[in-house]
Design a protein with these regions (language model features):
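A short, acidic, amphipathic alpha-helical segment used as a generic capping/interface helix at domain edges
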Residues: 192-202
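Protein kinase-like catalytic core scaffold
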Residues: 104, 152-155, 209, 223-225
Length: 249
């Protein structure tokens, strides 16, 4: 078993390789040339170079990684398989949402993560920026990261306020820069959160993924936000991934 990361400097891939005891394959200048008997963990790459593409078993095919990396494509292809927030690419729909008193999340970057390229607009007369994707804002009761491998949840963490953050927390966009982190021992995800996460990974054709799921504070419904195919891994999460991958080979 080998691992190839979209980012040569990925700390998560490095931590996982060390925990399993496998080699990371370099992007260039590698003497490794994988063949039919080899298994490759594809850590977030939508394209594989020739020296790894020949592996007999590739966990997370690059085409599946590409299909979830683009948020608009993800909503278009898999929105019927799991519950996602209401979305549109039509500014007429956005205007209706605003006129109804709702807020709208403008997504300027389709392949971003951690809140990159997000802008929230509200009010009936507000200008609507041109963007490739808009989602209806849903107030959060909680947000979870559910790690799924081969249809099974191997770990879960909840997003909480970072106790070491000294700035003003951003409750609308709960990312690291806004003062939030994922932590364990902060409750248990509901059955609906788990169900939506597993359904999203299975529908996408991925072997594994870290699914970000939010819970509506009004009715408790779980909504899939995105699937991470190269999540950051530390501590217990590294151990659980290593154990799960170790059971595959």
């Amino acid at each position: 078993m080998f691992i190839f990361s979209h980012n040569p400097g990925s700390q998560g891939a490095k931590n996982l390789a060390e925990a399993i005891g496998i080699r990371r394959v370099r992007h260039e200048g590698s003497r490794i040339n994988l063949g039919p008997r080899d298994t490759l963990i594809n850590w977030g790459s939508s394209r594989l170079p020739a020296h790894v593409a020949g592996a007999g078993r590739i966990l997370n095919r690059p085409e599946s990684v590409a299909s979830v990396g683009n948020k608009l494509r993800f909503f278009e292809r898999f929105g019927n398989a799991c519950r996602t927030v209401p979305w549109t690419a039509d500014r007429t729909v956005v205007r209706r949402w605003l006129d109804e008193g709702g807020n709208v999340v403008v997504r300027n970057v389709l392949n971003g993560h951690s809140g990159e390229g997000i802008e929230i607009i509200e009010g009936r007369g507000v200008d609507i920026p041109v963007a490739p994707l808009y989602t209806k804002y849903v107030g959060k009761e909680s947000e979870w990261r559910i790690h799924v491998l081969n249809g099974r949840v191997i770990d879960s963490t909840r997003k909480i306020r970072d106790p070491d953050f000294t700035g003003q927390p951003n409750w609308a966009v709960r990312n690291h820069d806004g003062g939030f982190i994922y932590a364990r021992n902060s409750g248990t995800p509901s059955e609906d959160v788990v169900r939506q996460a597993v359904a999203a990974v299975e529908a996408s054709g991925l072997d594994f993924g870290a699914v970000d799921v939010m819970v509506d504070r009004r009715d408790g419904a779980a909504y899939v936000l995105e699937i991470n195919t190269a999540p950051g891994l530390v501590g217990t999460t590294v151990t659980r991934y290593a154990e799960a991958f170790g059971n595959i080979r």
